[in-house]
Amino acid sequence: ELTYTLPPTLTATTGLDALTQLIEPFVCTRANPFTDGLCKEGITRVVRSLRRVVDSGQTVAARGSAGAPEIAAAREDMAVASLFGGLALANAGLGAVHGIAGPLGGMARAPHGAVCAALLPGVAAANLYALRRRAPRSEALGRYAKLAQLLTGDSGAAGDEVSKWLRRLVADLGIPGLGAYGVGPEHIPELVEKAVSASSMKANPVELTREELASIVESAL
């Protein structure tokens, strides 16, 4: 119930951070059956409920009401998904989104969830591109296809749908790019150098080059 009166923007950014913390352990190199179950269930709950809780926050702000019982169920979905993401990352790892977001947190006054939201679509696209070029037999390619199916509800969805779906979600929730927080092209070289050695980067499903990392940040501005 403490989440009912959160501003919609805060609900959106923290919800997208929770989603990131479910996606990254699912596709990372240390994914395992325990974390897979947590991630699949958590992602399903986010897909079902994130838009609803953001919309309900706007209703609360306007009318001062927590809304119908289904809103309580959606809030519970997001709380459970957040818990599952924490358990998953602790038992598998993260990836390039947090590998970049961690150092960026010390360079700019930007909300962590908003940073993750801005980076998430670009990282998904870059990982898929790199996997297909440099690791075409990687299990992670199948995981991205499964992720696409979880996000879209389409059993035939391919991995390319992940970044498209995420871009639409971030745009629909009104999350701005990193430029809104003062991050510009001049920050990219330093950020990339810090990201390369970030602990979260170690479990990314494929090693990304400095050029690829720079392109991700540029696309998130």
Predicted ranges, named:
Residues 107-110, 114-187:
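Gly/Pro-rich interdomain helix-loop hinge
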Residues 16, 43-46, 97, 116-117, ...:
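A general structural signal for well-ordered alpha-helical segments in protein cores
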Residues 19-23, 78-86, 120-123, 166, ...:
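Short alpha-helical scaffolding segments that buttress acidic/His motifs in well-ordered protein cores
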Residues 83-116, 198-203:
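Glycine-rich phosphate/pyrophosphate-binding beta-alpha loops
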Residues 185-221:
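Short, amphipathic C-terminal "tail helix"
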Residues 1-92:
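Carboxylate- and glycine-rich phosphate/diphosphate-binding segment that chelates Mg2+/Mn2+
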Residues 39, 75-78, 159, 188, ...:
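Hydrophobic packing residues in well-ordered alpha-helices of helical domains and bundles
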